[in-house]
Regions:
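N-terminal low-complexity segments that are often proline-rich with Ser/Thr-Pro
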Residues: 197-200
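Substrate-binding/active-site clefts of carbohydrate-active enzymes
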Residues: 1-17, 21-25, 32-195
Length: 200
């Protein structure tokens, strides 16, 4: 995602007075959580607003070269969405945007997908983008049976490392279904995300 006027939270902030003058009472956001896609329905990290919508304060690394499908080579993307400075700055900026929306008497609705996540999700980490980070992240369930997120997903066989036998939404391996029946932790984690958004 490149910067473009109106396509990020700064664009929304810049147009709030205009929206208020139009009589807008509610602003509905598609998912804003970290995700590799434009639509963001394949959430990678429920704890943070995507820096591509929020703030990128640390930016370095390489883009994926044409024809290269190994996402571990997309170091610019990885740095943007795994560095705490970018993630925290984006959450803080979103809180500011919500505060400004509320100051104008408008409400906010945030869309999110809680049935499934994306294969990039730090709990699954099928794309191995959290593997080599600075020990800030636990190994994903795709990588290791011992992952603390193992029960967040339903696996059909014991084929670690890189177990591709998990349940996906409509069978899509890029959209791993979350295993609410097998994990109280995933329910708790989502409840925490809901509470964070409700506090804004």
């Amino acid at each position: 995602i490149r910067e473009f006027y109106g396509g990020d939270l700064q664009g929304v902030l810049d147009k709030l007075d205009y929206l208020q003058d139009l009589g807008v009472e509610v602003i509905y956001f598609n998912p804003l959580f970290v995700s590799p896609s434009n639509h963001k329905y394949d959430i990678q990290d429920y704890d943070y607003i995507d820096p591509h919508f929020g703030k990128i304060v640390e930016d370095e690394g390489e883009l994926l070269r044409p024809g290269d499908n190994d996402n571990t080579h997309a170091t610019r993307y990885i740095n943007r969405v795994t560095r705490k400075a970018n993630l925290e700055a984006s959450n803080e900026f979103f809180a500011k945007v919500v505060e400004e929306i509320h100051a104008r008497g408008m409400k906010v609705i945030i869309d999110g997908v809680f049935n499934h996540c994306g294969s990039f999700n730090k709990w699954m980490d099928k794309e191995h983008i959290y593997r080599d980070s600075t020990d800030e992240y636990e190994p994903g369930a795709y990588e290791k049976y011992e992952s603390p997120y193992h029960n967040f997903f339903k696996f059909f066989s014991n084929q670690w490392p890189d177990n591709n036998s998990y349940d996906g939404w409509w069978g899509h391996d890029t959209l791993p279904k979350l295993n609410y029946e097998g994990s109280k932790a995933v329910s708790y984690t989502h409840l925490r995300a809901h509470e964070t958004c409700a506090d804004l």
